[in-house]
UniProtKB/Swiss-Prot annotation:
Belongs to the CcmE/CycJ family. The gene is ccmE. Residues 30-128 are periplasmic. GO terms for molecular function: heme binding; metal ion binding. It is found in: Cell inner membrane. This is Cytochrome c-type biogenesis protein CcmE. Heme chaperone required for the biogenesis of c-type cytochromes. Transiently binds heme delivered by CcmC and transfers the heme to apo-cytochromes in a process facilitated by CcmF and CcmH. Its main location: membrane. GO terms for biological process: cytochrome complex assembly. Residues 1-8 are cytoplasmic. Heme binds at residues 120, 124. Gene3D superfamilies: Nucleic acid-binding proteins (2.40.50.140). Keywords: Cell inner membrane, Cell membrane, Cytochrome c-type biogenesis, Heme, Iron, Membrane, Metal-binding, Signal-anchor, Transmembrane, Transmembrane helix.
Amino acid sequence: MQKIVRNRLIKIILCFCSTCLGISIILYNLEKNIIFFFPPSKINEAEQGKELRVGGLVKRDSINRISANKISFVITDNIKDLEILYQGVLPALFREGQGIIAIGQLSDNKFIARQLLAKHDENYRPPS
């Protein structure tokens, strides 16, 4: 009887330790994805020199086309503004007042984006 209880206890402890180890590995690997993006007002909290995601609304009258595929614009969270420089093809949903997420690095108070993601609104409208 004593041997059965001890074996059961060992199995329970091993299962508990395995579960804790698995959860720890998952959380460690998801660490940089826990905060999906920083708004312009919180960009100072992000690590400098690392790739970041910043998100906000494209400010009205801020889009400036530098060349055919190079653009600068300002995003805002209605607290602080941040200038974004991007070279590449713009997403189809990109426009003033639209929510976007830019992936890139911060350099001299300007954000150099390597990728833009346009956010659509949450309201579903069936085709008419």
